[in-house]
A protein has these predicted regions:
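Peripheral, non-catalytic segments flanking oxidoreductase cores
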Residues: 1-304
Length: 304
């Protein structure tokens, strides 16, 4: 099963009609796809990955295996409700939280190939990709080009940085349990050698194979499915734990602002409307549950 590849440059070229059709098909039938010719500087992508890897090795690797999580893989333990990951979350917009991680700020300044400005440039370029995709999705739904962008405004942009260390017993725990993402458009810079990410399609788990060609992996979150009234899909995905290697994941979220009111356009129909922060509050307790049941509950809560 071959994951779709969207040529972002073609959305503005002579093959725009074909590229837009491919984007629509990927969103409607897959909910995830690769993006090539995205315009992000490849050396910048490598610098960001190098920085994250160096920071993990220096500040997080040793402490991870001292956590209760690692100890829970003992013979009598039941680790079914934990995730084998070492992670933190950086906020970029509307407010930056880098000061909450003093060691990261220090590393930015010391690391001779990457600094805070480098990361800011990467996020700026990545946001442009997200906005371009949002325009394509909006147009394909028959809406104004800036519909998703306006609905999200001001958007919340943040990055989940995760490392999935080698696991002594990968049959008993997942790197990250199966779930859909709460937000909008998720753009992933992932490991180029260590596998693990899988998406659920047509009754089977589809592996997202590591690649070295600097494509960005994209998946849609719950808000896009809801705004499209189910035309586009947020898809169940998970990360397998691996016995060998330490997988890198840098996932940037282009989400609605907390007070953004989410509902389909009148053309697409959907009962009620709600603030994204209200959805997040409900999502926290149901993240690893059934998405259809969650959507039905949301409909009932906000259509009264």
């Amino acid at each position: 099963m071959e994951i779709p590849v969207i040529d972002l440059k073609a959305l503005d070229g002579d093959k725009r009609t074909e590229a837009m059709a491919q984007l629509h098909e990927a969103c409607e039938n897959w909910g995830f796809f690769w993006v090539k010719h995205h315009g992000i500087d490849e050396s910048l992508m490598e610098k960001v990955k190098d920085f994250v890897n160096c920071h993990y090795e220096k500040h997080m690797e040793k402490s991870f295996f001292e956590l209760d999580l690692a100890k829970e893989l003992g013979p009598k333990a039941n680790p079914s409700e934990v995730d084998w990951e070492s992670t933190y979350f950086l906020q970029h917009h509307p407010k930056c939280n880098i000061e909450d991680f003093p060691e990261i700020g220090a590393e930015f300044r010391k690391f001779n190939q990457c600094d805070s400005e480098t990361v800011e440039i990467y996020i700026h370029q990545l946001t442009k990709v997200a906005e371009k995709l949002a325009e394509g999705l909006s147009e394909n739904l028959g809406l104004a080009k800036d519909h998703i962008k306006k609905t999200f405004s001001p958007p919340f942009i943040g990055t989940k940085i995760a490392k999935y260390p080698h696991c002594p017993d990968p049959e008993r725990v997942f790197g990250l349990r199966a779930h859909t993402d709460a937000g909008g458009i998720i753009l992933l810079l992932q490991d180029d050698t260590v596998p693990g990410l899988e998406f659920y399609k047509d009754g089977m788990w589809v592996p997202v194979t590591p690649n070295k060609d600097h494509k960005i992996f994209v998946n849609l979150g719950d808000q896009v499915e809801i705004m499209s009234n189910g035309i586009y899909k947020s898809i169940l995905h998970r990360v397998r734990a691996e016995k060998e290697g330490c997988r890198l994941s840098i996932a940037t979220f282009y989400n609605p602002g907390a007070n953004a009111v989410i509902k389909p356009d009148a053309k697409l129909l959907y009962p009620g409307g709600y603030q994204f922060q209200e959805y997040l509050a409900y999502y926290q307790g149901t993240k690893f549950g059934d998405k259809a049941a969650r959507f039905q509950a949301i409909k009932e809560m906000f259509s009264k």
